[in-house]
Amino acid sequence: MILEIPKNAETILHILEKAGYEAYVVGGCVRDSILGRSPDAWDLTTSAKPEQVKALFHRTVDTGLQHGTVTVLMEKEGYEVTTYRVDGEYEAGRHPKEVTFTASLKEDLKRRDFTINAMAYNPSSGLVDLFGGLEDIERKIIRCVGDPLERFTEDALRIMRAVRFSAQLGFTIEEETRKALKVLAPNLQHVSAERIQVELVKLLMSPHPDYLRVAYEAGITAEFLPEFDACMTTSQNTPHHCYTVGEHILHSLCHVRADKVLRITMLLHDIGKPVVRKTDENGRDHFKMHGIAGEKMAAQILRRLKFDNDTIRKVTRLVKWHDDRPEGMTKAVRRAVNRIGEDLFPYYLEVQQADMLAQSDYRRTEKQERLDKVKEAYETIINEHQCVSLKTLAVTGKDLIEAGYKPGREIGETLNRLLEVVLADPQKNQKEILLGLLDEK
């Protein structure tokens, strides 16, 4: 098998080999090349020790000497070159306390997580595949190298990585590996929220975000997102739905594009339903105010998982308003844009579309027609530059002060009153007209 590798990476391999060392590109870049994907980075492994690597190249950065890693700079790119190593005992299910350098490529590959990530390649030796990674790629399987219980015990984050790779590649997790996931899922409590967040986002941004179901079935989500588990067991006995809340969420994820805010919003949009669910005397379920409850829960979840404030702001606002259904009249849509926010309204439209597509077919045509009218009205508002917030109101606080108003709460209240006038009739968004309205009072 011949793989195409970047010229700079090939140069590094050649220099190391010419100096008498073994050297290979390794891991994810080999996997992605075999799959016909463009690797994000090209990592190299070598029998040379870090100081020997540094002696061979003019420009290097000490990125992880304790783990045997030196970054070699070639032109404007950096390539991580790591010495063959054997990992010692892992600390708190995260990182090895110490590593031991080895002269054996096999020993180095043996410590890696999955067979598809445990292959090495160089142009002269070809593909080195000691654990069946190529066959597992062909069979579309995620399998641990060696004993999966050992691999997951070494670093519990590999539990999340197994599901994430499955979702990214559309692969099935091999049976013994899957069993080990279930046994060791509780070890995720030893993994930092930041590391879990990174893997969750990668899973959600993958071509198969609904593979979160695999994480649920293995008991993984119970460790960091128990609110989702509650959704999976919450039925929706209503004509509008044909799935449990959780299954509806999983289906909705597949109906939005791979945007971080959108995917996280779909994950959390109905997270409040289990806590507000009421069943009437006819056995029909109701979920009144689930957007409000969901907004609060989403904020708690996102903070717990250490998301940034901008993501929290956007997602919680979309969760709050996701079920808001203005009629298609332009006036109602102007008010909705004002409520939800100019920056978030396009997202809101995508959220509503995905939410609807993950429901039953009940009144689907009617729902789609209403949403299409809202989209049309929104286009009109944008194209005509209609005022939907204080930002584009023709009168400012400064204008009111000049008109004799005192700085303070009265100015804010007056501006909001004028905005209400303009939301009802955008033609009145003219300074003279608005100030004239004040004179009438």
Where are these regions (language model features)?
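Catalytic cores of the polymerase beta-like nucleotidyltransferase superfamily
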Residues: 1-441
